[in-house]
From Swiss-Prot:
Alphabetic keyword roster: Disulfide bond, Ion channel impairing toxin, Knottin, Secreted, Signal, Toxin
Protein name, entry field: U9-theraphotoxin-Cg1a
Species the sequence originates in: Chilobrachys guangxiensis
Domain notes: The presence of a 'disulfide through disulfide knot' structurally defines this protein as a knottin.
Domain of life: Eukaryota
Tissue-level expression: Expressed by the venom gland.
């Protein structure tokens, strides 16, 4: 009997956690961060990120900073 009550309590807790996670996913923030999906029309990237036309996700504004010599910058 005790284990049945524990299973019911844990089941309700898991159901609550899943429903709250789903609610957070549905009410996402207004802009996307790194590798969030975007299309440039209805979903946008936050400042510091651009929507990649190739992959349709948010990428950094300056992706090649580590490949350039220290004297040159893209931004």
């Amino acid at each position: 009997m005790k284990t049945l009550v524990l299973f019911i309590i844990f089941g309700l807790a898991a159901l609550f956690l899943l429903s709250s996670a789903n609610e957070l996913e549905e009410t996402e923030r207004g802009c996307g961060l790194l590798m969030d999906a975007c299309d440039g029309k209805s979903t946008f990237c936050c400042s510091g990120y651009n929507c990649s036309p190739t992959w349709k996700w948010c990428v950094l504004d300056c992706p090649n900073l580590f490949l350039l010599p220290p004297t040159k910058t893209l931004c």
